[in-house]
Design a protein with these regions (language model features):
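Family-specific functional microsites
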Residues: 1-216
């Protein structure tokens, strides 16, 4: 991936604006109305839900544990004299949830490096080298293991419904009975496209069934 794309993705993470289903509804409500999280099929797929979805829990736990292992190995490498890591391990940043009052692992995914973490590390080592490495590890792991996987899932699902980039552009800002549509044929085409997608979602292929077929 190009460095400009990596930067764009990091900025979008920071401002919680990756293209989740809830985010897509803002531009394509007609298309995504009623859609739920592609992984569990139960909750609305908000930014926070991508990382706290039950279906991603074991993966995220693995990433979190590997992050702690990596951090400890870096600390041992840079300062073999440290013997007690309990203050570090007790930080709230290792919790996999969202919390309005405390920084959690979800905030690390966004790219935040909380002061409480840097304060502890500062006592022990040359901070910057470790922070850069840890930050990059979390970014690469959550991006590859959770976000990219989720995106290929959605892509496959959309393809099965005939939703292409071109079709999305056609449907963007579309509202029935507005004045933009001036030919009957155009109107008919747009209703057809929407109806067939809706039928697929609501009556044809059940989303959950589709997902289980895809994974089995
Ligand atoms: Zn979910």
């Amino acid at each position: 991936m190009s460095s400009s794309k990596v930067k764009a993705h990091k900025v979008h993470l920071l401002i919680e604006e990756i293209p989740t289903i809830e985010q897509m509804k803002k531009s394509f409500l007609d298309l995504y109305d009623g859609w739920k999280c592609p992984s569990c099929g139960l909750e609305d797929e908000t930014f926070d839900h991508v990382w706290t979805c039950d279906e991603h829990r074991s993966l995220l736990l693995k990433i979190k544990n590997n992050t702690i292992d990596l951090l400890l190995s870096l600390l041992i490498e840079y300062n073999p004299d440290i013997t007690d890591y309990s203050a570090l391990l007790m930080l709230n940043i290792w919790t996999i949830s969202t919390d309005p009052d405390n920084f959690t692992f979800v905030d690390l995914i966004k790219g935040f490096i909380p002061l409480e973490l840097t304060q502890i590390l500062n006592l022990w080592i040359q901070l910057l080298l470790v922070i850069i490495e840890i930050r990059q590890y979390i970014y690469e792991q959550t991006f590859k293991e959770i976000w990219i996987r989720r995106c290929s899932f959605i892509k496959e699902f959309e393809r099965s419904l005939g939703i292409t980039k071109k079709k999305k552009l056609t449907l963007k800002n579309f509202r029935p009975f507005n004045n933009i549509l001036n030919s009957d044929r155009e109107l008919e085409y747009k209703f057809d496209a929407l109806d067939s997608i809706r039928n697929n979602i609501y009556f044809g292929k059940n989303i959950i069934e589709f997902y289980s077929n895809l994974t089995s």
